[in-house]
Amino acid sequence: MEEDEVAESWEEAADSGEIDRRLEKKLKISQRENSKSKSPPKAPVVIQDDSLPSGPPPQIRILKRPTSNGLASNPNACSRPAAPVKSLAQREAEYAEARKRILGSASPEEEQEKPVADRPARINQAEEIRQPNNVIRQPLGPDGSQGFRQRR
C-alpha cells in the first residue's frame, strides 16, 4: 500500500525520504537481474595456440577469362573494332558537314564576323549617355520646419 500513496508534491516526498526508498528498491531489483544475467557463457571459447599446426592453408584458385570466338582475349585488344585512321581533309569535311547541318553555316569565319555587326545599338547609346547619380538632400521639412531635426 505504500506504493499506492501519492505525495502532494515532490518536495514533500523528498523530505519524507519516500523518493530515496523507491530509488534504492529499484536499484536492488536491477542489481539482482544483472547478477542473474552475468552467468558464464554457455558456448565454450576456443583459444588457438600458435605453436600447434592450424590445419591446411586455404586454397587459392586462379581463374581464366572466358574466351571469345575461340581465341584468348588480349588485354590490349578492345571489344569494338578499331576505327580507320582518317586524314585531316576527311575530318575537316565531316566537321564542315556537321556544322552546316546543325548551325546552318559551313565555315566558322562567317560566325566570328557576324556578332560584331549584330551588337544592339541601345547598349552603345546607354554607355555614352550615362550621367552621375547625385542625391539631393533636404534637411528641412517641406514647409520650412525643422524636419527630422525637430525634437519632441
UniProtKB/Swiss-Prot annotation:
It comes from Xenopus tropicalis. Residues 66-77 have a biased composition (Polar residues). Residues 28-152 are annotated as: Disordered. This is SUZ RNA-binding domain-containing. The gene is szrd1. Belongs to the SZRD1 family. InterPro entries: SUZ, SUZ-C, SZRD1. The lineage of its organism: Eukaryota, Metazoa, Chordata, Craniata, Vertebrata. Residues 42-107 form the SUZ domain. Residues 111-152 form the SUZ-C domain.
